[in-house]
């Protein structure tokens, strides 16, 4: 190949390359995690509590001593009931063991079988024991009963 075809002559016409095409600037790439102004990356973003009122305070659940008017025993028309006028005295502590029950079978002092609520609302621990003993059962404070079977229970304070 001849040398005259492979190179431009020195000092001859040499044109600079054309400028690159003009393109719009790309938008900024989002950073991860998202910046704090859009929730800080937690989905969903935290609630805006500035325009909301707080929820009302919770109330204390009722205890086992109130509202005991059970209607009595058949033909007497309510002669043996407690109307709850003693201020709702609680026989069992609030919390897990809060259900007053008369249980006929005790297993190792913690599990009880054949449990039923007392026939009327007891006035105190000794009254609770008397109500249950009338049916041949024992006064116990239990977790919420499930079909009257296999309850976790503890002794009633003041039932002796």
Swiss-Prot record:
The keyword Secreted applies. Pfam families: Hydrophobin_2. Coiled coil: none annotated. InterPro entries: Cerato-ulmin_hydrophobin, Hydrophobin_sf. Keywords: Cell wall, Disulfide bond, Secreted. Aerial growth, conidiation, and dispersal of filamentous fungi in the environment rely upon a capability of their secreting small amphipathic proteins called hydrophobins (HPBs) with low sequence identity. Class I can self-assemble into an outermost layer of rodlet bundles on aerial cell surfaces, conferring cellular hydrophobicity that supports fungal growth, development and dispersal; whereas Class II form highly ordered films at water-air interfaces through intermolecular interactions but contribute nothing to the rodlet structure. Homodimer. Homodimers further self-assemble to form highly ordered films at water-air interfaces through intermolecular interactions. This is Class II hydrophobin 8. It comes from Trichoderma asperellum (strain ATCC 204424 / CBS 433.97 / NBRC 101777).
């Amino acid at each position: 190949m001849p040398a005259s075809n492979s190179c431009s002559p020195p000092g001859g016409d040499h044109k600079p390359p054309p400028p690159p095409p003009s393109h719009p600037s790309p938008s900024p790439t989002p950073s991860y995690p998202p910046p704090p102004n859009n929730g800080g990356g937690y989905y969903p973003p935290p609630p805006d509590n500035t325009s909301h009122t707080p929820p009302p305070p919770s109330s204390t659940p009722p205890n086992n001593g109130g509202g005991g008017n059970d209607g009595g025993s058949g033909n007497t028309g309510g002669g043996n009931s407690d109307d709850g006028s003693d201020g709702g005295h609680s026989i069992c502590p609030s919390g897990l063991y809060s259900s007053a029950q008369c249980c006929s079978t005790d297993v190792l002092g913690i599990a009880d079988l054949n449990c039923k609520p007392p026939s009327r609302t007891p006035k105190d621990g000794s009254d609770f024991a008397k109500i249950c003993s009338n049916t041949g059962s024992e006064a116990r404070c239990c977790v919420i009963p499930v079909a009257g079977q296999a309850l976790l229970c503890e002794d009633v304070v003041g039932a002796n």
